[in-house]
């Protein structure tokens, strides 16, 4: 009967996944039913990134008048590699002085403890990057990435093309035990037999903000002390790469068609800005204002309206954060903006009612290999409410419209009180710890894989009997951790001051 080998890992501190502060440790269990010759037993911690990209047929150039099949490009990056020997002990191993003679281990039950250091903050593949290496991030911005697509075998099925292309990238961390047998070598068995037992672990580093993927430009001052973000695309379609050059880091940020699978040569793609914003330089913490790229025209033919989301912290979300509750810093300040030469009475004569609300989370996963990038798009519905016009509490009141100073046109605003809706105020982000295609919800960037998210706020409007829709896209950094509690510095303990007498 073959020896039975198992790895029992100590659970992580949070009980769900290993993080940056965890020491990965455990026990190797070996059961032998008969004597076995063993040279050594080692346990290793390995991490690697693997990507496969393909070229679309329209970008494949024919050779000799013949159109060949699309080529594959593969990339492999080592992230971490540690090794511990648990048998024989160090003093015995040192005494052998290089002898290859095995140990004859008697039948029985054996346990060996092991422990690795904390995972480093930087991947080990960075030392192999040259100035011409094309990556999504520069060396200074690169951090140890989280596990991704650990169940890639279940996705790698040709009957579902979305999942098939999604499985082309993976980040795997594995603890593997290796037993080197000590059987004598012969001419027909020149190598020692190895017995291996791997166990994949899930690693997600501690929350840490990284540089935003959006390219922004400063365009003057705003009268209200806010940053204006305008989405230029109907879906998140940016594929940005970083190439180390002699003069510094060159950003390559192409935009492609709205496809679920895209392959291009990064050198042939144009640079395009996804967002524009304005900032009031005098404010220390300006509020950001995200608005629709395409406003809705009103029946008078000269006026328009759009939806704005104002927040300081909406670009970061933790698990179980409230999305609409007042004070959440997410969708608790949403406004309807009307621009034109309308007065209060003119706008009141127009029937404007919200009828439906939907909030989606857009996912963009990009893979890179040998200068060829592929993108995968998907959408997750976070919530949906119909029949808003029949609600007991209207979302906005036209009597609360107020004018905002403007040079050329009159601008009015009215708050859309999503925070007062009894259903929305209880909604928390990712309360059930949802796994999308086997992966928890989190954003990250690494050398050859990026996973980015954006909110998509859709509101259907009934304007004088016609149904129109506004769309607001907001890029967001998603963390799989719960928000850490605020650190409140405790006041020093009160000490009675010394007393002094008047006489000497």
From Swiss-Prot:
Its recorded name reads Arrestin-related trafficking adapter 10
Q: Which organism is it from?
A: Candida glabrata (strain ATCC 2001 / BCRC 20586 / JCM 3761 / NBRC 0622 / NRRL Y-65 / CBS 138) (Yeast)
Q: Which keywords belong to this entry?
A: Cytoplasm, Endocytosis
Q: What does it do?
A: May regulate endocytosis by recruiting RSP5 ubiquitin ligase activity to specific plasma membrane proteins in response to extracellular stimuli.
InterPro entries on file: Arrestin-like_C, Arrestin-like_N, Arrestin_domain-protein
Q: Which gene encodes it?
A: ART10
Q: Which GO terms describe its molecular function?
A: protein-macromolecule adaptor activity; ubiquitin protein ligase binding
Instruction: Tell me the compartments it is located in.
Output: Cytoplasm
Biological processes per GO annotation: ubiquitin-dependent endocytosis
GO CC field: cytosol
| Family statement drawn from the similarity comment of this UniProt entry | Belongs to the ART10 family.
Record-linked Pfam families: Arrestin_N (PF00339)
Does this entry carry the keyword RNA-binding?
no
